[in-house]
From Swiss-Prot:
PTM summary: Acylated. Acylation may be a prerequisite for conversion of the monomeric 37 kDa laminin receptor precursor (37LRP) to the mature dimeric 67 kDa laminin receptor (67LR), and may provide a mechanism for membrane association. Cleaved by stromelysin-3 (ST3) at the cell surface. Cleavage by stromelysin-3 may be a mechanism to alter cell-extracellular matrix interactions.
One GO cellular component term: cytosolic small ribosomal subunit
UniProt organism field: Salmo salar
Protein name: Small ribosomal subunit protein uS2
Gene this protein is translated from: rpsa
Ranges of compositional bias, category Low complexity: 271-284
C-alpha cells in the first residue's frame, strides 16, 4: 500500500509505539476472515498480528478519509469506554462528527428522528460492540472502516484495520496514528517533523483512578503544609510606615525614660544612674544580715551603759 515510497514506510519509532501499546497482541480466538492478518500464534494461545499489514490498512483508511471533501461527513463511533476519549480527540483534530456512548438506533435510517444523519463514511472502534451502526450503514450504502481484532466479525466492514481493539493503550494509539496520517495526507502537518500531540491524550483514563490520584495529591499537599507549619517559625512583619511628606515629623514610638532624682547635677552618668542610698531611719529593720557582727571583748571594763543598768557597785538592797 505504501507503493515503495520511503515517506510512507513504517518507521522504527512507529513499530516501537505499536509494541509498547500491545497493538500486535490479538485474542485467543480466530475469525476465518482475519486469518491472513495474523503472523503466528504464541504458546499461550494468543495470536500475534502482522504489524506490516496493520500499517498498510491504516494508510488505506487515511486515504479514504482524506477523499471526503467535507470532514463533517465522516462519522466516528465508539460505544466502548476505552475508545470514547480517542474518538473525541480524533474528531477535534480532523473535524469529523462523533457519536460517543450509546448509538441511537435509526440514526442513519429513520428520517423522522431529530438526530438523523447521512454520513458519507463510518468509522467504528469495535465491529462486535458497534454492530448497530454497521448494520444501518449497510442499509443506506455507507462505506465503513473498523478496527478489528483476531476474533472480530467482518460483516458489513469494507476496510478492516487489524489491531488490538480491547486495550485502552492500543485503541488510543491507533486513533492517534490515524489522526496523524490524515493530517499528513491533507498537508496540515509535515512528515519531516514529529507531531507535537502526544499519544497519551488519546488514552482512556478510569474515573476512579483519576479520583484516587487527585485524592493522593490533595493528601500530599495537606501533609506538606502541616510539616511546614510545625517546623517553620512565622515571619515577623517589619513593614515600615511610608512617609509621604518628609517635612512633617515622623511618629516615634514611646520609650520609657529613666527618671533621675533631683540634685544629681555635676555627677557622672555612672553615679547618677546608681541607686541612691536611703537613710538608715527609712530602712527600718532592713539590715544586712550577711555582715559579720562585731565581737565584744568580755575582759574589758564595763562601760557607762553597763553601769547605768547595774554592776558590781550597784546597790541591790
Amino acid at each position: 500500500m505504501s507503493g515503495g515510497l520511503d515517506v510512507l514506510q513504517m518507521k522504527e519509532e512507529d513499530v516501537l509505539k505499536f509494541l509498547a501499546a500491545g497493538t500486535h497482541l490479538g485474542g485467543t480466538n480466530m475469525d476465518f476472515q482475519m486469518e491472513h492478518y495474523t503472523y503466528k500464534r504464541k504458546s499461550d494461545g494468543v495470536y500475534i498480528i502482522n504489524l506490516k499489514k496493520t500499517w498498510e490498512k491504516l494508510l488505506l483508511a487515511a486515504r479514504a478519509i482524506v477523499a471526503i471533501e467535507n470532514p463533517a461527513d465522516v462519522c466516528v463511533i465508539s460505544s466502548r469506554n476505552t475508545g470514547q476519549r480517542a474518538v473525541l480527540k480524533f474528531a477535534s483534530a480532523t473535524g469529523a462528527t462523533t457519536f460517543h456512548g450509546r448509538f441511537t438506533p435509526g440514526t442513519f435510517t429513520n428520517q423522522i428522528q431529530a438526530a438523523f444523519r447521512e454520513p458519507r463514511l463510518l468509522i467504528v472502534t469495535d465491529p462486535r460492540a458497534d454492530h448497530q451502526p454497521l448494520t444501518e450503514a449497510s442499509y443506506v450504502n455507507i462505506p465503513t472502516i473498523a478496527m478489528c481484532n483476531t476474533d472480530s466479525p467482518l460483516r458489513y466492514v469494507d476496510i478492516a484495520i487489524p489491531c488490538n481493539n480491547k486495550g485502552h493503550h492500543s485503541v488510543g494509539l491507533m486513533w492517534w496514528m490515524l489522526s496523524r496520517e490524515v493530517l499528513r495526507m491533507r498537508g496540515t502537518i509535515s512528515r519531516e517533523h514529529p507531531w507535537e500531540v502526544m499519544p497519551d491524550l488519546y488514552f482512556y483514563r478510569d474515573p476512579e483512578e483519576i479520583e484516587k490520584e487527585e485524592q493522593a495529591a490533595a493528601e500530599k499537599a495537606v501533609g506538606k503544609e502541616e510539616f511546614q507549619g510545625e517546623w517553620t517559625a512565622p515571619t515577623a512583619d517589619f513593614a515600615q510606615p511610608e512617609v509621604a511628606d518628609w517635612s512633617e515629623g515622623v511618629a516615634v514610638p514611646s520609650v520609657p525614660i529613666q527618671q533621675f532624682p533631683a540634685g544629681i547635677e555635676g555627677k557622672s552618668f555612672t553615679e547618677a544612674a546608681a541607686p541612691s542610698k536611703a537613710p538608715a531611719a527609712a530602712e527600718g529593720f532592713a539590715e544586712d544580715w550577711s555582715a559579720q557582727p562585731a565581737t565584744e571583748d568580755w575582759s574589758a571594763a564595763p562601760t557607762a551603759q553597763a553601769t547605768e543598768w547595774g554592776g558590781a557597785s550597784a546597790d541591790w538592797s
